[in-house]
Design a protein with these regions (language model features):
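Short, hinge-like loop/turn segments at secondary-structure boundaries
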Residues: 35-40, 148-151, 181-184, 208-212
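Conserved catalytic-core segment of NTP-binding enzymes
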Residues: 13, 88, 95-104, 109-196, ...
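N-terminal phosphate/diphosphate-binding loop that engages ATP/GTP or pyrophosphate donors
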Residues: 10-72
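Extended, charge-rich low-complexity interaction segments
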Residues: 218-236
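C-terminal boundary of histidine-terminating zinc-finger modules
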Residues: 206-221
Length: 256
């Protein structure tokens, strides 16, 4: 979500009309754009109104630099299915035409494709390009590989393709080289490698993106370059996921 919000902020600084939709029950995708946790998610309003009318303006919160922020929300703790909630929420967004006149919509989706609900932006054609954020840690790469499997499964139904891997550094040994080989092995590219810097944490404490908190910083420029790389990216592919044993061997090789 930190990467997603900074990319949204970078696109908005490029003059794009941007919307970001958080597809995670935690409701925290747009926190850095709004300066607070979203107080009214789509599913919150659905529960409150019990089938009554909801206005588009009620589910859209305008954040940094005019970015339209929407949180799908989730079920009450211990009740219902979060994945199903995302299906309901995105359908409501579509019905209400809540995105307005936007140039770019960013869907921030939970990392693991744990059920069909979380794959809705891929499966139902909401998204055209998928970017996977991953570190060089084994379980992060495992999740990335699972998402690649999901993209491959649903790519035949529409135009969705994988645009690349966004490296999100955890300071693992030889991390950038590992991520680059992983990306190339599954048939895509390492479109950016984001270093782990304390300024990102400092900005989060102030409930801001790096683009807002420190717009002249080197880290802000990293996110701007990523946004430009996404804007001009023409390498969109259907991935060829790895088998786990091969992935594990690759990680071990770079760790030695």
């Amino acid at each position: 979500s930190t990467t997603a919000s900074n990319v949204s902020a970078a696109f908005s600084q490029m003059g794009k009309r941007v919307a970001q939709i958080g597809c995670d029950p935690k409701n925290d995708s747009t926190r850095l754009l709004l300066g607070h946790i979203c107080r009214h998610t789509v599913l919150d309003l659905e529960r409150e109104r019990k089938g009554g009318e909801i206005g588009a303006e009620e589910i859209v919160n305008v954040g940094y630099n005019g970015i339209r922020c929407i949180e799908a929300g989730g079920p009450e703790p211990g009740v219902g299915c979060a994945g199903r909630g995302i299906i309901v929420a995105l359908e409501k967004v579509r019905q209400l035409e809540a995105l307005g006149d936007t140039d770019l919509v960013l869907y921030d989706v939970l990392g693991d494709v744990v059920c069909g609900g979380f794959a809705v932006p891929i499966r139902e054609g909401y998204a055209e390009e998928i970017y996977i954020v991953s570190s060089g840690e084994l379980m992060s790469l495992y999740a990335a590989n699972n998402i690649a499997k999901g993209i491959r499964k649903f790519a035949s139904r529409g135009r969705v393709k994988l645009g690349g891997i966004i490296g999100n550094s955890r300071k693992v040994a030889h991390e950038e080289e590992l991520l680059r080989e992983f990306a190339e092995t599954i048939g895509t590219q390492l479109i950016a490698f984001i270093p782990r810097e304390t300024i990102v944490h400092d900005a989060e404490i102030h409930r801001q993106t790096v683009l807002e908190y420190a717009p002249q910083s080197t880290q802000a420029e990293v996110y701007r370059r990523l946004a430009k790389a996404i804007e001009t990216n023409e390498k969109l592919t259907i991935p060829e996921p790895m088998v786990f044993d091969e992935l594990e061997e690759m990680v071990e090789r770079y760790g030695n």
